[in-house]
């Protein structure tokens, strides 16, 4: 079976976090090639399956990325419809409307007035990755939060405002990685944003915040039953919505003030899966790719 792994021109060999996937696929008998997603010379129809892994520049050109996904069609995983929906964080409103516990999120579109802010908040754009253009603001610097919202919406982008949940300081984020609807491994990510920190500095061509490249940021972790139940509900909703279980997904969650898990993000476009943190994770993803969900 011929498998194309879609990456970007800035990561032509992929990224260390998830590179173990390539030899795992080869050991399983696949013919694997890394291809740059927006290279016009790639014949995507020559591949049996195309798997999105490292197109980490897509947030700069989302429309082109979605068009590319739709042109590749049904050989693509995750599916084009999932990529279109999940590549803008307004999908959180859909999940909340479906009754899933989601971190309270206010969307501010271009032309909307800046909403009243309460307590410590996080501001970020709906199309972004790697903590880019993101800030954490206490009430003392709400004027800076409003300025970031206005900068984003003034540039034609939609901003989102969420409360900062202090439980992240003690426990971090829990991320459950799912392959074909089954749990593969659990990650623990420490807090990224320092108090009153706006748009952390980037030191990488992809524009991700400096802290996102810290090798100590994410480690193998454990999930409790409530977190596992939430991850299963989220993936179940996506499967029902699109008629197919996503091949891969990372379900990021925090603990709210009442001690229950709430969804922070569902990463189903190009999440870092941190395959190297957990023995067998790369092999599980390879098996899912070679026998994708239906």
Predicted segments with their positions:
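Active-site nucleotide/adenylate-binding loops and adjacent lid/helix of ATP-dependent enzymes
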Residues: 1-7, 69-73, 81-174, 179, ...
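Conserved N-proximal alpha/beta basic substrate-recognition cap immediately N-terminal to
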Residues: 9-109
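Short secondary-structure junctions
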Residues: 30, 100-101, 118, 240-247
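A short beta-turn/loop motif at secondary-structure boundaries
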Residues: 41-43, 165-169, 254-257
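A short beta-strand motif that forms the metal-chelation/ATP-contact edge
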Residues: 47-51, 124, 174-178, 255, ...
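Glycine-rich phosphate/pyrophosphate-binding beta-alpha loops
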Residues: 56, 131, 192-195, 267-277
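Phosphate-binding site of ATP-dependent enzymes
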Residues: 139-241, 262
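ATP-dependent carboxylate activation and anion-phosphoryl transfer catalytic cores
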Residues: 223-294
């Amino acid at each position: 079976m011929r498998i194309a792994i879609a990456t970007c021109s800035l990561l032509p060999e992929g990224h260390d976090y998830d590179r173990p996937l390539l030899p795992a696929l080869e050991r399983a008998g696949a013919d694997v090639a890394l291809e740059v997603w927006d290279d016009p010379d790639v014949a995507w129809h020559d591949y049996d399956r195309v798997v999105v892994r490292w197109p980490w520049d897509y947030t700069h050109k989302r429309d082109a990325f979605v068009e590319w996904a739709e042109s590749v069609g049904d050989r693509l995983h995750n599916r084009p419809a999932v990529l279109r929906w999940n590549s803008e964080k307004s999908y959180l409103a859909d999940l909340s409307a479906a009754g899933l516990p989601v971190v309270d999120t206010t969307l501010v579109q271009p032309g909307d007035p800046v909403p009243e802010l309460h307590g410590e908040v996080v501001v970020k754009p709906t199309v972004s990755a790697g903590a880019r253009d993101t800030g954490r603001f206490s009430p003392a610097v709400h004027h800076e939060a409003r300025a970031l919202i206005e900068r984003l919406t003034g540039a034609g982008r939609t901003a989102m405002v969420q409360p900062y949940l202090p439980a992240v300081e003690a426990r971090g984020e829990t991320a459950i990685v799912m392959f074909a609807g089954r749990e593969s491994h659990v990650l623990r990510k420490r807090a990224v944003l320092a108090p009153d920190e706006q748009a952390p500095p980037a030191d990488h061509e992809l524009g991700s915040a400096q802290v996102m490249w810290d090798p100590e940021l994410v480690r193998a972790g454990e999930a409790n039953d409530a977190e596992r139940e939430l991850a299963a509900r989220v993936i179940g909703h996506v499967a029902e919505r699109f008629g197919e279980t996503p091949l891969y997904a990372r379900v990021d969650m925090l603990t709210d003030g009442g001690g229950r898990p709430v969804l922070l993000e569902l990463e189903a476009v190009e999440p870092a899966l941190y395959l190297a943190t957990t023995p067998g994770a790369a092999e599980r993803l390879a098996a899912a790719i070679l026998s994708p969900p239906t």
